[in-house]
Amino acid sequence: MRIIKGRKRGKNKKPTLILKIHVIQAENIEALKTFNCNPVCFVTTNTFYSQKTNKLKNSNTHWNQTLRIKLPRNPTSEWLRIIVYDALPTGAPPTTPSRPRTTTANTSSSTLSNSGLSSHSHSSRNLNVTSKGNQTSTSINSVSSSATPAPSHSSSSLSTTGPGSTHKNRINSYLYLGEAKISLLDLFKRKDTTTSYKFSIEAQRYHLYDMKGGKDQDSLNCNFLVGDILLGFKLECNVKRTPTFQAFNAWRNELNTYLGRIDRNKARMRSSSSLPPPLEDMLSNSSAVSGNEIRREKPYSDTDLAHDEEVNAEDEIDAEESIEDMNSSGSICTERRYDIDNDTIFDSISEVVSLNDEELDILNDFEEADHPNVPDINVHDIDEDTRISLSSMITALDEYDIVEPEDVAKLPAVSENDITSVDDEESENQQESDEEFDIYNEDEREDSDFQSKEYIGSRLLHLQRGKHNKSYANYLYRRAKSNFFISKKEHAMGVVFMHIGAIKNLPALRNRLSKTNYEMDPFIVISFGRRVFKTSWRKHTLNPEFNEYAAFEVFPHETNFAFSIKVVDKDSFSFNDDVAKCELAWFDMLQQQQHENEWIPYEIPLDLTVEPAHAPKQPVLYSSFKYVSYPFLKKSFWKEAVDTSVNLERLDIIQVMLYLERLGSFTMADSFELFQHFNKSAWAGQSITRSQLVEGLQSWRKSTNFKRIWTCPRCMRSCKPTRNARRSKLVLENDLITHFAICTFSKEHKTLKPSYVSSAFASKRWFSKVLIKLTYGKYALGSNNANILVQDRDTGIIIEEKISAHVKLGMRIIYNGKSPESKKFRSLLKTLSIRQGKKFDSTASAKQIEPFIKFHSLDLSQCRDKDFKTFNEFFYRKLKPGSRLPESNNKEILFSPADSRCTVFPTIQESKEIWVKGRKFSIKKLANNYNPETFNDNNCSIGIFRLAPQDYHRFHSPCNGTIGKPVYVDGEYYTVNPMAVRSELDVFGENIRVIIPIDSPQFGKLLYIPIGAMMVGSILLTCKENDVVESGQELGYFKFGGSTIIIIIPHNNFMFDSDLVKNSSERIETLVKVGMSIGHTSNVNELKRIRIKVDDPKKIERIKRTISVSDENAKSTGNVTWEYHTLREMMNKDFAGL
């Protein structure tokens, strides 16, 4: 049972096929008989899925080992290669007595030189690969020899020096002997029939060929047969519930799809470039498998795989070949692969054996990254006068293709203009003007990863330019999207700068054990909405001096918030103690500032929260504030930017170009425009002054909208939020104007960072934070944890709902496991809910009213009635007329249906990603398949309103309209607590509910769904079908328990309020009341909320009690909820006789 819900690895991944190769022995290899060798066998499908046998001595080839390799989930080739090498003695030079000596030269990049080779010549190649960290140095030298051994075989020795070696200069060299190449598509076919497969192959002999020496032959012959190897195979699936047959079918379809796409791309290339078709690949060299190949035209189903017909097809060229200079017919084209995750290029022929044992193990354990589909080749723009002579071009060959020099000379010269791209139209669509290509559009979704661009077998080297050009364009686009932007729709009103100076006259605290006074170690926690700052602490002082600063943005919906300041005493081992607190309204601070960019000093008296409550002198916080508006910052941006980053008085064209290039995307022509603006000749040595540069940038069209600015002019960095900012999910300072203001201010002042979720969490000790994370989950805005954070919409106060520790832990264990889906658990919840409802309908339950009011500190001044006969009558109590009036008379405003904690999502997909984690959650299931053409996951927005037991439990109409026929849906009684909603259980789709259609003239038809929950007796409606209701009119009520109301509305003509959407995207519930605006049609603007100034501590405490319970009441009841005591009494009575 998991306490903390983590990410399930591999849940959505395809099953992996495990191929077991039983390598028994090699036979009839002449080199092993002639020389004293140390044979080793490598088995590989590509660089990352490779294994090798142990190294044997004295030419012994009886390995008798079983190697396990994973088949790639996204295969690009059907071939399995079994390569036999001779492991040369450690430290020995990579040469043999009968071979000419070779020389190696270490260079910083791979160098390849080839020598001529006739059909009777023998080539010796020496590869020296030195790896250190992430740097790889490779040199390959070929030396030809006129000697003609019989039968001759090409040798390839490779030297490696790796960090895992025992000695610093230890060399591991391998001499190539031969290999077998086996098709995985043919390997498991039964020989007696073509309609069935066998995934366990008994040991058979397979021929080993010298592939390097045999490349100049039209077909294999005995001259290049070097021996045999005895192999057995077995294919398995790593997922037990998935049959091997099904997994192999999926793997084969994936491969056929990939190869079919390659075939089509190369066919287009041949037709567009007028080049002759490529040379045919050599067939499989296995003597134990059929030479017939599979035609790759369509995916295979499970039945097709069992009853397939044998057909012939061509063996296509590998899509990932690189281009190598071919000056002779005996040269080897090296296949290269690109590791997206590690940005490391490996040679699949040689570097499979260039890695030491530790590196091979690591590579083999890698999970394969999901490669995107291979794109078609995109050709870069080519000059008209460019001509290409194919006789001097580099040809790209398959591993076994040979092009004779005379064949190359016969190829015609082709103009680059004759080479057309299959994606010209796509490339033109991507090339947009600066005005149309708005890379700062917030509505577009940013891609998280770079797409892999693989070379797909082009015959011309310059065709790769299109790939690099497209990749570079994508890089520029993503870089711009991930950097600063200027939002025209919504930006901060300005930036507030706060100076925390000092505190005077703090009281000496009294030690509870020694009864002596001591000086504290104070620090300050300052919160403004969801931003929480914490100063450093001062040791043993009652008059601490901090001299620290805080700077942050203020948005329009935060103008009614206040600064909450708390002084805390730091303790080394025990919990930190709150000492004093105070409040300062932001609106009051703004009214006292007379001039822009002016510091306003404050002496704020502090209210003590420790004994004695009245010190000899009242503590005072000395601080100052400054507010700078956004228009002022934008107007002075370029002057401050140039003064900060440019020290020269005059700048020439080169200096201007360098400066603009550091800021973002500017061309040489852009720099010329600045000089032309002042009638300056750029290349005549003339220059412009700093003031002219500022003036030009302020009036220049390309700089006034800030689209091309990618880095901060002061720090020259792009927008990369800190780890603490990502953890707390704060409003990221991604606006260039406000970031530059804060960045410039931080250069000269010690500035604090908003790194905490709440002021209570900022004052906790480190071990408390560790314990909370281990038991409840990561304490952060937006994380899936057991901490329920609610923000009051009027004041901006963020408070955590108080739930006892064992209740949190119990709910986390139950709803993250399989218990909720069990029949016994569902039956228990239903029985308890019905029993509790009957109990609270009895007159004896009236005695529970007073403890409930006391525990939740409820204010009953707005209640219409005072006397209640049963607890349920009190629970669904009515309020006095006029207590919950709509905020506006505009009929195109949608209002809150209940006093609740609200989360809203513009799309259903967002709600699934952020809040509702049920596996089977869908609008179709929630609405009981009501009008699925209109109400589905693609067309609707959703609002979720959760009612806690202490809330007013009558629900009201959110708009004007006509009530449709209510549909009652029976279901379960799961809790609607966010911990359960964020589990994999579909709470909303399984619980009891009523579907109420409302036909509104302004919003169209919407669904109003009251949902019952644990301990809810029933859902009662006070409206009937065809009733015409107005905004705020009562529709019904819940009996005892927590509950939820969901509103589903088509989003084609509707938008939720921006502050609710912002909070919901960070998993923060917003406290709303009946009549508050929650959204509007697209015809009207969002309702501007009236600022509510709350200075009275009693009112602030009342808001906190509405969200949670008071500290005193929580402690008096053992820090457990009132429902817990009720359930405990019921359980004690039921099981008293046991």
From Swiss-Prot:
Free-text remark on how the cofactor is bound: Binds 1 pyruvoyl group covalently per subunit.
Catalytic activity: a 1,2-diacyl-sn-glycero-3-phospho-L-serine + H(+) = a 1,2-diacyl-sn-glycero-3-phosphoethanolamine + CO2
Site (Cleavage (non-hydrolytic)): 1042-1043
Any one of the GO CC terms: endosome
Required co-factors: pyruvate; Ca(2+)
Composition bias, Low complexity: 98-121, 136-166
Phenotype on disruption: Decreases induction of mitophagy in stationary phase following growth on a respiratory carbon source.
Alphabetized Pfam families for the sequence: C2, PS_Dcarbxylase
InterPro entries xref list: C2_dom (IPR000008), C2_domain_sf (IPR035892), PS_Dcarbxylase (IPR003817), PSD-B (IPR033177), PSD_type2_pro (IPR033179)
Membrane topology of this protein: Peripheral membrane protein
Protein name: Phosphatidylserine decarboxylase proenzyme 2
